Amino acid sequence: MMAAIAAADCGHQVTIIEKNEKLGKKLFITGKGRCNITNDSDVENHLNHVISNPKFMYSAFYSFDSSRMIDFLEQEGLAVKTERGNRVFQQSDKSSDVLQTLQKALRRRNVTVRLH
């Protein structure tokens, strides 16, 4: 969804083809159902401690780090909070709020979604 939003922001017409019956279905199971959005630590920490193949993720993490993700969500109207271990969740603790925020962002950008 974020890649589609980024492409649409660059002026591209975008279609998401989703194999599941619902877009973002897997967001509901992250963070024990609360949707752990990101980890608010610096890129080097991610590359050295979180990722098993840092070279693969290097350019992606430096192009769009956790602070940019947090800024994006807040600009889209989603309040977030940082918990123990720098884990970032939405204030409501409802994964559905993250999904709704992303879906609204897709609609505002006229991204087409094709489901299962």
Feature map (PLM): residue ranges:
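A conserved short coil-to-beta-strand element within the FAD-binding core of flavoproteins
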Residues: 115-116
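Conserved N-terminal/central alpha/beta ligand/cofactor-binding core
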Residues: 19-112
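N-terminal Rossmann-like FAD-binding beta1-loop-alpha1 element of flavoenzymes
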Residues: 1-16
